[in-house]
Curated annotation (Swiss-Prot):
Cytoplasm recorded as keyword: yes
Protein name stated in the entry: UPF0298 protein Sez_1612
Organism: Streptococcus equi subsp. zooepidemicus (strain MGCS10565)
Predominant place of localization: cytoplasm
NCBIfam families: PRK02302.1
Keywords assigned: Cytoplasm
Pfam family name, one: DUF2129
Lineage: Bacteria, Bacillati, Bacillota, Bacilli, Lactobacillales
InterPro entries xref list: DUF2129
Subcellular location: Cytoplasm
């Protein structure tokens, strides 16, 4: 049966957009911002350490960040509607 592969996103900041094609061999390209010069790629979580090290060594890469999407709690329990707070009485000044 099909096993779901654990994936993680990497945000890769580049010096020049022309080098984006060179990074695509490391994972699946999800988004390329030409204006801000960064890429979002997805890789297998088990290969993250070695690919992160390889990508960081490339001369045209400015910075690599690991996505924090896995750290976000997605369990929403209860009512998401917030009740307005009642106004508090101000103490009298005398």
């Amino acid at each position: 049966m099909f096993q779901k592969q654990q994936r993680i996103g990497l945000v890769i900041y580049l010096y020049y957009n022309r080098d984006a094609r060179k990074v695509m061999k490391y994972g699946d390209l999800y988004y390329h911002s030409r204006r801000s010069r960064y890429l979002v790629i997805y890789i297998n979580k088990e290969d993250m350490e070695e690919k992160l090290k390889d990508i960081s060594r490339l001369t045209f890469v400015k910075e690599v960040k690991v996505s924090a999407f896995d750290d976000i709690d997605c369990d929403f329990v209860g009512n998401l509607h917030r009740e307005p707070l009642e106004p508090q009485a101000l103490p009298e000044q005398g």
